[in-house]
Amino acid sequence: MNKKKALVLGATGQDGSYMIDLLLKKKYEVHGLYRKSSVGNTGNIDHLIQNDKVYNKNFFLHKGDLLDSVSLNNIINKISPKEIYNFADQDHVGWSYEIPSYSFKTTALSVIEILEIIRKKKQKI
């Protein structure tokens, strides 16, 4: 039996990490995407990274950026997930006031990019 395969965007955040835990309990193969700039900020998923029975067996991490459609496309094509969960966002509240265009790109335009990648893939996700 093939395992269900999911991609969780925003893997190191609170909601993304909870989703990863749930999917692993349901016997999924889970791939998590985390922003390159959040390296070292893996506290919410350290219990998985440090578990030799899970990490790189049922749970895999990928560095990426929602604003880089090429890397997103490459990751989605490489993994071929059946499900994608998007919990990613810019996590600095102050930035949303100081650089509103960045917040807009991260929360709105990135979703459009993800949907476009899925549409072009012509595979049911």
Predicted segments, located by residue:
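N-terminal Rossmann-like NAD(P)+-binding domain of SDR-like oxidoreductases, especially those catalyzing
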Residues: 1-125
